[in-house]
Design a protein with these regions (language model features):
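Extracytosolic helix-loop segments that constitute the early lumenal/periplasmic catalytic or substrate-binding loops
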Residues: 28-39, 44-76, 80, 88-93, ...
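Transmembrane-helix signature of polytopic, membrane-embedded enzymes
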Residues: 97-101, 121-144, 163
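Short acidic/glycine- and proline-prone juxtamembrane loop motifs at membrane-interface regions
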Residues: 147-160
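Perimembrane helix-loop-helix junctions
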Residues: 171-174, 204-236
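Membrane-lumen/periplasm interface segments of specific transmembrane helices
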Residues: 229-345
Length: 449
C-alpha cells in the first residue's frame, strides 16, 4: 500500500513538473518573440495588411467590414479573434498602456488560449481514465509539443480555433455520456465560436452530428422528441455564430464560402515523391529562400517539421543573430533529436490510433469510438487532400489540424493502459527525449529573438 502511494505521489510530482514546464516554455517564448516574428498571415501592426491590420481595423471603431475582404490580405477570415484582440488593446489603453505595448500584448490572449487548450486536453485524458505512465505520456506530449509553443505566440486566429476544437471534443464526449442541456449549449457555443474564429473549426462538427444521430437512433419516442428539442436549440445557437460572417461576405461581396487565397511556395514534385520520398538533409523545413535546392514537398516530412519548427530554419536564425558555429550546431543537434523522437512518436501514435479505434477492447462505448474515429479520420482526410490538391508548401502546415495532437496523445495513452511489455519503456524514453529536446530548442531560440 505504501509503495502504491509513493508511486502515485511520484506521478503527481511529474504531472506538476510537466505543467510548470508547459507554462514556462510557452510564456518565455511569448516573452522573447515579437508580435511580427514567426507569424502566419499577420505581417505586422501598422502595415495596413494582414491579420494585424484586421485587428487594427476593429480597434479603430469599425463594426463590420464595409468592403470586399479580398482587397486586403487576411481580412477574409472570420473576425472573432480580431474583435477580441481589438477590445483587449482598447482595455490596455484605458489602463494606461501605450498603443505599441498593447499591440505586443495581444500575445497574452493567444498564450491564454494555449493554456485553456492544455487544460481541456487533460480533461479529455481524465474522461478516458488515463492514469500513471499513460497519463504522464499523453499529457507530456500535449504540454511540450512545439506546435502549441509556436501558436502561443502567434497572434493570428489559429490558436483560438484550436482551443474551441479541443473544447468541442471534450463537451461532445460529456454530452454522449449525459445529454443534458448545459452540454448541448456548450457544444453549440464551442462549434459556433470556433467557426467564428476560423471556418476550419467546422471539421469537428460532422463527428458531433454522428453522436447526435446515434442518440436519436437509440432513443425511444419520448427520448427522440427531447433530443430533437436539443438539436433545434443547438442549431439556433451554433449556425448563426458560425456562419454569419462567411454568408455576409458571400451575399454582400460575392466571396465564396470557405474562400482561401492562393499562397505559398510552389511544390512541383510528382505525387510519388510527395508521399514516399522521405529523404531530408536537415531537421528544419527545406525552402529555397533558405538556400535549399527545393521547397519541402513530402507531406509527411512537411507535417512533422511544421509542427515542430513552423516554417523556420532555427539554425539559420541562430547564425543571423550572431550565434553561428557552436550555437547553430547545438540547435541543429537538438533539432535532429526533436525531429527523430517526434517522428517515432508519431508512428507509434498512429499505430495506437488504428489499434484503439478498430478494437472494442480499448474503448468500450461504440459511440465514443465512432466519434473519435470520425474526428481523426475526417480531419486527416481533409488535411491530406488539402496538401495534395493545393500544390504549395504552405498547405502542409500542421497548425491547421493542431487539435489532433491531444487526440493522438490520447490514443497512445489508451493503448498503454494496462500493458507491461516493452512498449511502456519505449514510449517513456521517446517522450523524455521529445520533452528534453523541445525544451532545449525553444530555450536556445531565445538567443535568436
Amino acid at each position: 500500500m505504501k509503495k502504491k502511494s509513493s508511486r502515485l505521489n511520484l506521478i503527481s510530482i511529474i504531472m506538476a513538473a510537466v505543467s510548470l514546464l508547459a507554462v514556462v516554455l510557452r510564456s518565455f517564448y511569448v516573452y522573447y518573440t515579437p508580435s511580427w516574428m514567426r507569424q502566419h498571415d499577420v505581417i505586422g501592426f501598422g502595415a495596413g495588411d494582414g491579420q494585424a491590420a484586421f485587428i487594427e481595423y476593429f480597434h479603430q471603431g469599425h463594426l463590420l467590414i464595409d468592403f470586399d475582404p479580398r482587397e486586403k490580405w487576411g481580412f477574409f477570415q472570420p473576425p472573432l479573434h480580431h474583435m477580441l484582440s481589438a477590445l483587449w488593446i482598447r482595455l490596455q489603453e484605458v489602463l494606461g498602456f501605450a498603443y505599441e505595448a498593447a499591440c505586443e500584448n495581444v500575445q497574452i490572449l493567444t498564450l491564454i488560449y494555449s493554456f485553456i487548450t492544455l487544460y481541456f486536453s487533460y480533461l479529455i485524458f481524465r474522461h478516458f481514465r488515463l492514469e500513471k505512465t499513460a497519463m504522464v505520456t499523453a499529457f507530456a506530449i500535449s504540454a511540450v509539443h512545439p506546435g502549441f509553443i509556436l501558436m502561443a505566440g502567434s497572434i493570428n486566429n489559429d490558436m483560438l480555433a484550436v482551443m474551441f476544437s479541443v473544447m468541442t471534443i471534450y463537451y461532445a464526449l460529456k454530452w454522449n455520456e449525459d445529454p443534458r442541456w448545459s452540454y448541448t449549449i456548450a457544444l453549440a457555443l464551442t462549434i459556433g465560436l470556433g467557426m467564428m474564429a476560423k471556418l476550419s473549426a467546422a471539421l469537428v462538427a460532422p463527428a458531433v452530428a454522428l453522436i447526435f444521430v446515434v442518440k436519436w437512433i437509440h432513443a425511444g419516442t419520448d427520448g427522440f422528441v427531447d433530443h430533437m428539442k436539443k438539436f433545434v436549440v443547438f442549431s439556433v445557437i451554433c449556425a448563426p455564430l458560425g456562419l454569419w460572417s462567411p454568408l455576409r461576405n458571400m451575399i454582400r461581396f460575392g466571396v465564396p464560402v470557405g474562400f482561401t487565397p492562393e499562397v505559398g511556395e510552389p511544390v512541383s514534385a510528382p505525387l510519388w515523391q510527395r508521399i514516399f520520398d522521405i529523404r531530408t538533409a536537415k531537421p528544419f523545413v527545406c525552402l529555397e529562400k533558405y538556400g535549399d535546392p527545393y521547397n519541402e514537398f513530402n507531406i509527411f516530412l512537411g507535417m512533422i517539421k511544421t509542427s515542430l519548427f513552423g516554417d523556420q530554419d532555427f539554425a539559420i536564425a541562430m547564425e543571423e543573430a550572431g550565434h553561428g558555429g557552436l550555437g547553430a550546431g547545438m540547435m541543429t543537434a537538438f533539432g535532429w533529436i526533436l525531429f527523430i523522437s517526434a517522428s517515432l512518436l508519431a508512428i507509434l501514435c498512429f499505430i495506437a490510433t488504428v489499434r484503439v479505434l478498430c478494437s472494442g477492447r480499448f474503448i468500450a462505448k461504440r459511440s465514443e469510438r465512432a466519434f473519435m474515429a470520425a474526428i481523426y479520420g475526417i480531419s486527416v482526410a481533409v488535411y491530406i487532400r488539402f496538401m495534395l490538391v493545393s500544390g504549395s508548401y504552405s498547405s502542409m502546415d500542421f497548425r491547421y489540424v493542431l487539435y489532433l495532437i491531444p487526440v493522438e496523445a490520447l490514443m497512445a495513452g489508451i493503448w498503454m493502459k494496462g500493458r507491461n511489455d516493452r512498449l511502456i519503456p519505449a514510449m517513456g524514453i521517446l517522450t523524455l527525449a521529445f520533452t528534453v529536446s523541445a525544451t532545449a530548442v525553444y530555450l536556445m531560440l531565445s538567443m535568436a529573438g
